[in-house]
Amino acid sequence: MQLERAAFSDPFSFLGPQYQSKGIALRVWMPGAVSMVVEIENGEKFPLTREDESGFVLISKMDLTAAVYKLHISWPTGEQTIHDPYQFHGFMPSGDALVSPSKMHSEMGAQLISLNKGGQPISGVRFLTYAPNASAVSVIGEFNAWDGRRHPMQRLDDGLWGLFIPDLEDGTQYKFELKDSSGNSLPHKADPWGYSSEQYPSFTSIVYDQSRYQWQDKAWQTRPVSVKHQEALSFYELHAGSWRRNEQGDFLTYRELAEQLIPYLSEMGYTHLELMPVSEHPFYGSWGYQPIGLFSPTSRFGTPDDFKYFVDQCHLAGIGVVLDWVPAHFPSDDHGLANFDGTALFNDPDPRRGWHQDWKSYIYDYGRDHVRRFLISNALFWLEHYHIDGLRVDAVASMLYLDYSREHDQWIPNHDGGNQNYDAISLLRWMNEEVYSHYPNAMTIAEESTAFSGVSRPTDMGGLGFGFKWNMGWMHDSLSYIQEEPVHRKFHHNTITFPLIYAFSENYVLSLSHDEVVYGKGSLLDKMPGDEWQKSANLRTYMGYMYGQPGKKLNFMGAEIAQSAEWSHDGQLEWHWLEYPRHNGMKKLVSDLNHLYQDLPALHELDCSPEGFEWRVQDDAETSVLAHERFALNGDKVLVVSNFTPVPREGYTLGVPAEGEYEVLLNTDAEKYWGSGTPIQQTVKTQLLEKHGLAQSISLDLPPLSTVFLAFKQHA
């Protein structure tokens, strides 16, 4: 019997009240029950007759199709009263649940709803999933002893399966039990749209009420739409499990992070927190980049309400929250999307397109409609339900190119014979259009490591539509330069200046991310040449240079305290080093740089425009000195001068365009930053002496290994 094998796809045709020639037949399938009684609305009770080992029936003249009834069930271990799920026929959404990405996340999965039948409201959970190639799907959980025979789902249109189970509440654990097209049992699956989840070993999904949390960030959410390109954006990239641990070495919870991290971010002057992926992921060592529960914040650090509280508190402190989002691939764990209905439902079955060789994970099939809507719905979900301010899209290059990290015989060209993945390109454009149309104050950021054109260009101009792109070229070239011994830097001068050739081809974020301090690469401090003092001085110079360059800023946690060891997800940052001036000085410097960057429009308003930057000294390779000016929309300007050698440059002369004076705002060599404290003029007047093709010039005493910021004041 199909019910006995949990292989029935049309339970409403047999279970619940059914019309027949002798009246209404009420059938209930309840494996393990001893006896059963039905109670109708007026309180009358009627025993059901056992038809076979697990089935019960009542033949009645009463119309049970319109009224609500209860079942009183006797089990070997006790009594139970429930509303029969199979009396609620016709309460399922249509295939429209899969059509609109902005609505999908509120329709699919486990939704707490209240139905009205016969004038009586009945609360419970409506389960809805997508498995077009399955022959049967059941909901299993604690409520039915994880028995797939008890709650078979109804096959609906368009590949959907649904069932309303009354009386279930927030916090109910569940999974889906599926059979493939041949009737073979599949591994129990977590809900692809599940709002909450449990970690190893159960990997269960958990019913969660999205409306329960009471947000306090209305002022933040309703602030006027701003031009992000002209804002000071300074991101602190963070891995929640290894920023700080408690005294026992355990993770901080979301609420503990709110208490400890947010004041730190405010002190340090960061405008935004960028969280490495918080979507549920079974393998902690993946850092979140192998997600399975795309709609569920990881339970390692608390509940969904706890994560909402964390975001809420960030907003109340004036700090935006950006999430790393991973649409490039998904892991092969049995309880996830892999082989969900017995087929490659979410990935291309051909491994040349559907399997990532480096990461040993599946690649989404971006050409399939349900996959596209699933991913876009997920992007919108985080902005809607968790008030997230932006998405940093991971591994975009791997999506754009069919031959990404493949040999010539390991990929399939597109229909034009090329290597671009047109479906992925289309998906990213659609995602950006949806995000910016629904949430105009949000931002999307691409981690894209190639020269693909127009990543941050609007879609109506042929671009991908991202707000920003990480400048991987700047990161690579600048780190390559700063790792050279100072005496050799003159031979690599073009390496540090080259990124300015393309600095305005995209809306760039200058990123010093986690990727640069793992896998044997060492910490930023460890990359620097020289003795202990020179390492710190080089890093201070480099940080100053970064904050003076055009582009938004991103630092991975630990850079701001000159972490000496490379990052490990199994521990915490080296906070103990802050007892020493070398590290505490770096912390003070990064804080001052962030606040300077925010306070001076010249350092951020035209980050993405060539009108905001001019070289003053570009080609002095012999001394390894660079100088440029940054401009605000109102014409205010800041001069940034970097000396990349440990040799003080007394009376260094550089040309400037106008008469006036320059006032020192910040000097990375200052003693409070653990610098040498080499004397430097605090105010420098221009002189009528031509230099670098300009009529005016100034003479500066440049400290060794330093970056100096100076504000210009024009003479009346």
From Swiss-Prot:
SMART domains named among the record's database cross-references? Aamy
Q: Which InterPro entries match?
A: A-amylase/branching_C, Branching_enzy, GlgB, GlgB_N, GlgB_N_E_set_prok, Glyco_hydro_13_cat_dom, Glyco_hydro_13_N, Glyco_hydro_b
The set of disulfide-linked cysteines is none
Q: Which UniProt keywords apply?
A: Carbohydrate metabolism, Glycogen biosynthesis, Glycogen metabolism, Glycosyltransferase, Transferase
Q: What taxonomic ancestry is recorded?
A: Bacteria, Pseudomonadati, Pseudomonadota, Gammaproteobacteria, Vibrionales
The top EC class is transferase
GO biological process assignments: glycogen biosynthetic process
Biological function: Catalyzes the formation of the alpha-1,6-glucosidic linkages in glycogen by scission of a 1,4-alpha-linked oligosaccharide from growing alpha-1,4-glucan chains and the subsequent attachment of the oligosaccharide to the alpha-1,6 position.
UniProt-annotated catalytic positions: D394 (nucleophile), E447 (proton donor)
Record-listed E.C. numbers: 2.4.1.18
Q: How does it assemble?
A: Monomer.
Q: Name one GO molecular function term.
A: cation binding
Provide the reaction this enzyme catalyses.
Answer: Transfers a segment of a (1->4)-alpha-D-glucan chain to a primary hydroxy group in a similar glucan chain
List the pathway annotation. Answer: Glycan biosynthesis; glycogen biosynthesis
Family of this protein:
Belongs to the glycosyl hydrolase 13 family. GlgB subfamily.
* Protein name as it appears in the record: 1,4-alpha-glucan branching enzyme GlgB
